[in-house]
Regions:
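Well-ordered beta-strand positions in beta-sheet-rich domains
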Residues: 29, 167, 200-203
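Solvent-exposed, acidic/flexible segments
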Residues: 54-63, 99-102, 106, 112, ...
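Bacterial N-terminal signal peptides
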Residues: 15-24
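Active-site or metal-binding loop neighborhoods of secreted/extracellular toxin and effector enzymes
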Residues: 173-222
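Substrate-binding cleft of extracellular glycoside hydrolase catalytic domains
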Residues: 82-108, 113
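Active-site-adjacent substructure of cysteine-protease-like catalytic cores
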Residues: 104-190
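Active-site-adjacent structural segments surrounding the nucleophilic cysteine of cysteine proteases
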Residues: 26-92, 147-160, 182-184, 197, ...
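Bacterial N-terminal signal peptides that target proteins for export
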Residues: 2-16
Length: 222
């Protein structure tokens, strides 16, 4: 049989192209774009995937926050397999620690979100004035998504241990936030304690004074 080098080369090139396309489709996404949704610039993600993970079980906020982050980055539900050992195994989820003062942390969160990557943030309680109960807390308001926009709900009683703190997955920022003058309250998170409010996606707005800068404040992708 006579061989045709040109035909063989074309077949090889076609096979190589098919393999590249297959690998590209199978590879996880590296980022998710920020898009404005009713006044909040929010990373794009499938809300149903986050809701399928649901709210945390006791003591596992770090693991749930990591699962939310990986789900957003990969575009598929993260089971969290291999990512828990008496606390989230950050490296198993492709996250690493970042430390700095408050200004550095806020700008890092802003830059990571702008690059399409969720940030996992370590919170401590702060004292809130003008309330009748639960004066020490990590959050005050949450926002429920409906067809007409976000509904603000006063849900004040999320508080945390002074020893361990609380982990959330930051996924959004106020549309009118000033990059030169950032505040904690500019940012919105998927809070493992309340990511699902009876099946409705809920975002929690960070409270000023809650990022635990002295104790492993951020986990970032990469």
């Amino acid at each position: 049989m006579q061989h045709c080098p040109a035909r063989a080369a074309r077949q090889l090139a076609a096979a190589a192209l098919a393999l590249v396309l297959l690998l590209a489709l199978a590879a996880p996404r590296a980022h998710a774009a920020l898009q404005e949704k009713h006044g909040i610039r929010l990373l794009t993600f499938d809300h149903s995937q986050i809701l399928s993970i649901g709210n945390q079980t006791s003591g596992k906020c770090s693991w749930y926050a990591l699962r939310y982050a990986r789900t957003i980055l990969d575009g598929r539900v993260c089971s969290g397999s291999g990512m828990w050992s008496n606390g989230a195994v950050w490296s198993a989820g492709g996250y690493t620690g970042y430390s700095g003062d408050l200004s550095a942390c806020l700008h890092t969160i802003y830059n990571e979100l702008s690059a399409g990557r969720p940030v996992i943030v370590h919170l401590k309680n702060t004292t809130v004035s003008g309330v009748n109960k639960h004066t020490n807390r990590t959050s005050t308001y949450e926002y429920h998504l409906s067809g007409s926009g976000w509904t603000q709900v006063n849900y004040p009683h999320i508080a945390t241990s002074d020893t361990y703190g609380h982990w959330v997955c930051v996924v959004g920022i106020r549309a009118d936030a000033d990059p030169a003058n950032l505040k904690e309250s500019d940012f919105y998170a998927l809070d493992p304690a309340r990511v699902s409010a009876n099946g409705t996606l809920a975002l929690t707005r960070l409270l000023d004074g809650t990022i635990w800068t002295a104790n492993s404040p951020l986990k970032i992708a990469g």
